[in-house]
């Protein structure tokens, strides 16, 4: 290797080993639809179904913002968290474990 050339890093990569048995992988492969079978299934759909799809999308586009489903994350209120903590002893058992471990370390 030349002194000015960038160094190449070589990693020892283990051979890929499948996590599932070959028989299971074969079963999964057989169940998966092929692109050709998907085309055949789509050709058999009746035109009524396609018309229903169009009207549903038009209805959702014409709906007012209040009528559309709003998905907004609302975090739990502190009142609810305190209630859970009182019920179960702790809403966050992981925090209690780490706190007791810290106390043990300080005592020793």
From Swiss-Prot:
A Gene Ontology annotation in the biological process aspect, one of them, is: cell division
A single GO cellular-component term from the record reads: cytoplasm
Q: Where is the composition biased (Polar residues)?
A: 55-73
List UniProt keywords, sorted A-Z.
Cell cycle, Cell division, Cytoplasm, Protein phosphatase inhibitor
InterPro entries on file: PPP1R1A/B/C
Subcellular location(s) per record: Cytoplasm
- Major location (coarse): cytoplasm
Q: Which residues form a coiled coil?
A: none
**Basic and acidic residues bias: start-end ranges:** 45-54, 99-108
Example of a GO MF term: protein phosphatase inhibitor activity
Annotated region Disordered: the residues are 25-108
Give the record's family classification. Answer: Belongs to the protein phosphatase inhibitor 1 family.
Describe its function: May increase cell susceptibility to TNF-induced apoptosis.
Q: Which PANTHER family match?
A: PROTEIN PHOSPHATASE 1 REGULATORY SUBUNIT 1C, PROTEIN PHOSPHATASE INHIBITOR AND DOPAMINE- AND CAMP-REGULATED NEURONAL PHOSPHOPROTEIN
Name recorded for this polypeptide: Protein phosphatase 1 regulatory subunit 1C
Q: Which gene encodes it?
A: Ppp1r1c
């Amino acid at each position: 290797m030349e002194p000015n050339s960038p160094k190449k890093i070589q990693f020892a990569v283990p051979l890929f080993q499948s996590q599932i048995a070959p028989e299971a992988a074969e079963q999964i492969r057989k169940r998966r639809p092929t692109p050709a079978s998907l085309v055949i299934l789509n050709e058999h759909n009746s035109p009524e179904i396609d018309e229903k799809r169009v009207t549903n999308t038009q209805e959702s586009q014409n709906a007012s913002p209040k009528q559309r489903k709003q998905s907004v994350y609302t975090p739990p209120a502190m009142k609810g968290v305190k209630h859970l903590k009182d019920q179960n002893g702790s809403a966050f058992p992981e925090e209690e474990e780490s706190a007791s471990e810290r106390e043990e370390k300080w005592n020793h």
